[in-house]
């Protein structure tokens, strides 16, 4: 099937927001108006098209980013719906990596919320152009201008209004279009299909003129001819204004702001027009940089069908009917089903079996796909999130994604032998789908340990195990992922000798062990000269070191940020072996950790609590009692916002306690910030519990 749309007519964009800002509802309306859905799915009814996992429909939140293709004004829109809950930030990050633009949805009542800040920063990191949609304008307390001010104050954005609201709260009727200088009014509740253009209401005329001037001044800054004409008293016409807003979005000179109420079907069609008019196509975003697979030099791939084929896998899902589905963004070239590709990240060959175009969870088989497409491939064997797939003859590695370390873990014990087998299969699939979810086995108890980004993250994984994979299991209490770290440089000389009739064991190692920079991880270097330890025994030394790294000496937690040098040693012609050196290095490192003053590290979370003013004192007192350090507080509307750093160990069950002493009126978000040393008194308790 040849290309149906030129690459200039593609818009690959995501919808990003804080939880509950109305992101999924906005996507549902877009699908309805672009003709993909004949019935609108409401989130609060648990029927939204994009939220197709049972866990999402029950909880009313979006967990996985579903990808959907639809059409508006002869343009092809590929939409990625992203989760807004902080435990799923990884999903947002993966989606932004492959998008060309984004719509940032704000709750008209709440403005810029903590997760909005997080996704905004992630969009900055990947340089994603965006427009802002202030949603829920029909809600009590909705304040469009406060939202605009928030964009400046909280995320250092550059908002420029393209619309103003007509009416507010329950009397919200439509918007003033500042480019056309007309009011767009929606009448009745007939799914918003009927709207009319009218003159701007008299009471808004002055405000509209003021904001149109701001819009024009922001636009003419970008074009010398338009600026010269404007200084001569000639305003840019409608087409020029649209062109300049498009330039501004592409250059990230400013962020256009629109408004509406997706739930009440008002403002969605102009939002779709803005996506088409202002967000970039893959061609506008230009070439993508990569590394040549053979020479390791930087190369580029242009967004063109004639360039060598390259694409990035950004999400993996397990589908009950098709098996493993890998979502990919094609950056250059074209691909046909049946093609043989190279996974250049892992040096593995992959064959493209079925190629699918996805609509939430319906699918359409396609035979060919082109630069700019977002497709789902069934049956890839070795591909993981962040891998590059490309033409084997012109191989390239596109930039890799970075994934955060998990900070919380739970133990899982299957109830029967059959459950044990099902658990193994299920966990390998879940870990492949989500790089921020890790699975390991406790070396002492043999228990399976699940690690994730927060309580909700692990709750949902356990839910999927029980429902989708029918695994019956006992689930332990959540535990903090502590770490151990050396505090000072130390030198150790250790000899392992064992003589029991016949061949004995002999190995001597001399190590220098010192702390590494925070976040630098583990490094090992052999400085052996003159064959004091033969080369074939060095891997044995490393193996011994790494076995201690996984379980430190204080309480069996992983050892981080450590640098080990092997500076000397000795061996015996007959009695030495790789195993003897493994045993020697293991004992030597344990001794070094004892001598080098090992300490315990704990994850510290960045916590934001939004509370009515009356409860401010109680909230701060409670955070202090949890070893929290208050970083600051400010007002947001009539609520107080408190920012603090609190150890994760003291935050379990916080949601219920916060609800109880604020009568359910406060809410909070938290995300991992850094590791720091546990105070001695607390460390003794932790060691007593785990050692």
From Swiss-Prot:
Residues 8-283 form the tr-type G domain. It comes from the Bacteria. PROSITE patterns: G_TR_1, G_TR_2. Gene3D superfamilies: 3.30.230.10, 3.30.70.240, Elongation Factor G (Translational Gtpase), domain 3 (3.30.70.870), P-loop containing nucleotide triphosphate hydrolases (3.40.50.300), Translation factors (2.40.30.10). Keywords: Cytoplasm, Elongation factor, GTP-binding, Nucleotide-binding, Protein biosynthesis. GO terms for cellular component: cytoplasm. It is found in: Cytoplasm. InterPro entries: EF-G-like_DII, EFG_II, EFG_III, EFG_III/V, EFG_IV, EFG_V, EFG_V-like, G_TR_CS. Disulfide bonds: none annotated. Its main location: cytoplasm. One of its GO terms (biological process) is ribosome disassembly. It holds the Pfam family GTP_EFTU. GTP binds at residues 17-24, 81-85, 135-138. PANTHER family: RIBOSOME-RELEASING FACTOR 2, MITOCHONDRIAL, TRANSLATION ELONGATION FACTOR G-RELATED. Catalyzes the GTP-dependent ribosomal translocation step during translation elongation. During this step, the ribosome changes from the pre-translocational (PRE) to the post-translocational (POST) state as the newly formed A-site-bound peptidyl-tRNA and P-site-bound deacylated tRNA move to the P and E sites, respectively. Catalyzes the coordinated movement of the two tRNA molecules, the mRNA and conformational changes in the ribosome. NCBIfam families: EF-G (TIGR00484), PRK12740.1-3 (NF009379), PRK12740.1-5 (NF009381), small_GTP (TIGR00231). This is Elongation factor G. It comes from Methylobacterium nodulans (strain LMG 21967 / CNCM I-2342 / ORS 2060). The lineage of its organism: Bacteria, Pseudomonadati, Pseudomonadota, Alphaproteobacteria, Hyphomicrobiales.
């Amino acid at each position: 099937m040849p290309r149906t749309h030129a690459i200039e007519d593609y818009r690959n964009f995501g919808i990003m927001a804080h939880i509950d800002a109305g992101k999924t509802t906005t996507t549902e309306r877009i699908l309805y108006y672009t003709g993909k859905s004949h019935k609108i799915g409401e989130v609060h009814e648990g029927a939204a098209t994009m939220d197709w996992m049972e866990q999402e429909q029950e909880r009313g939140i979006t967990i996985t980013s579903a990808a959907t293709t639809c059409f508006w004004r002869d343009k092809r829109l590929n939409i990625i719906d992203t989760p807004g809950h902080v435990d799923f930030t990884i999903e947002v990050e993966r989606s932004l990596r492959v998008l060309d633009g984004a719509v940032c949805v704000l709750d008209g009542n709440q403005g810029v919320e903590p997760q909005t800040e997080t996704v905004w920063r992630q969009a900055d990191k990947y340089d994603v152009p965006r427009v802002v949609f202030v949603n829920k304008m029909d809600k009590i307390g909705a304040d469009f201008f406060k939202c605009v001010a928030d964009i400046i104050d909280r995320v250092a954005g550059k908002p420029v209004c393209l619309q103003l609201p007509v009416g507010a709260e329950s009397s919200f009727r439509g918007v003033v279009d500042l480019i056309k200088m007309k009011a767009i009014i929606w009448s009745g509740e007939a799914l918003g299909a009927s709207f009319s253009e009218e003159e701007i209401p008299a009471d808004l005329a002055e405000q509209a003129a003021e904001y149109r001037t701001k819009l024009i001044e922001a636009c003419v800054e970008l074009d010398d001819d338009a600026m010269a004409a404007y200084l001569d008293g000639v305003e840019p016409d409608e087409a020029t204004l649209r062109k300049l807003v498009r330039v501004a979005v592409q250059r990230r000179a400013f962020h256009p702001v629109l408004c509406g109420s997706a739930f009440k079907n008002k403002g969605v069609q102009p939002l779709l027009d803005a996506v088409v008019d202002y967000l970039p196509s893959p061609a506008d975003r230009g070439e993508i940089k990569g590394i040549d697979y053979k020479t390791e030099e930087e190369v580029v791939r242009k967004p063109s069908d004639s360039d060598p084929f390259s694409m990035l896998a950004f999400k993996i899902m397990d589908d009950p009917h098709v098996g493993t589905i890998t979502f990919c963004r094609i950056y250059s070239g074209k691909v046909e089903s049946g093609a043989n590709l190279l996974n250049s990240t892992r040096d593995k060959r992959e064959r493209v079996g079925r190629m699918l175009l996805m609509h939430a969870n319906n699918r359409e088989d396609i035979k060919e796909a082109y630069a700019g497409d977002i497709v789902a491939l069934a049956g890839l064997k070795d591909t993981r999130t962040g891998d590059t797939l490309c033409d084997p003859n012109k191989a390239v590695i596109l930039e890799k994604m970075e994934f955060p370390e998990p900070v919380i873990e739970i133990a899982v014990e299957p109830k029967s032998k059959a459950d044990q087998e099902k658990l193994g299969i299920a966990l390998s699939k879940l870990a492949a789908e989500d790089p921020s979810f890790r699975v390991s086995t406790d070396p002492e108890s043999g228990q399976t340990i699940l690690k994730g980004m927060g309580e909700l993250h692990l709750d949902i994984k356990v839910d999927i195990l029980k429902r989708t994979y029918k695994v019956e299991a006992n689930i332990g209490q959540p535990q903090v992922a502590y770490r151990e770290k050396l505090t000072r440089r130390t030198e150790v000389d250790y000899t392992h000798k064992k003589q029991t009739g016949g061949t004995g064991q002999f190995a001597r190692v001399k190590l220098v062990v010192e702390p590494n920079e925070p976040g630098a991880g583990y490094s090992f270097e052999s400085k052996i000269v003159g064959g004091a330890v033969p080369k074939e025994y060095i891997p044995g030394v490393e193996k011994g070191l790494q076995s201690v790294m996984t379980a430190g000496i204080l309480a069996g937690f992983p050892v981080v940020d450590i640098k080990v040098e092997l500076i000397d040693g000795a061996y015996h012609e007959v009695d030495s072996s790789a195993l003897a050196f493994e045993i020697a290095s293991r004992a030597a490192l344990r001794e070094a950790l004892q001598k080098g003053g090992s300490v315990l590290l704990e994850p510290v979370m960045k916590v934001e609590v939004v509370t009515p003013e009356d409860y401010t004192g109680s909230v701060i007192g409670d955070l202090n009692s949890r070893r929290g350090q208050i970083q600051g507080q400010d007002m947001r509307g009539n609520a107080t916002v408190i920012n603090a750093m609190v150890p994760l160990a003291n935050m379990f069950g916080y949601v219920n306690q916060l609800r109880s002493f604020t009568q359910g009126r406060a809410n909070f978000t938290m995300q991992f910030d850094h590791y720091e040393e546990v105070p001695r008194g607390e460390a003794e308790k932790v060691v007593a519990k785990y050692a």
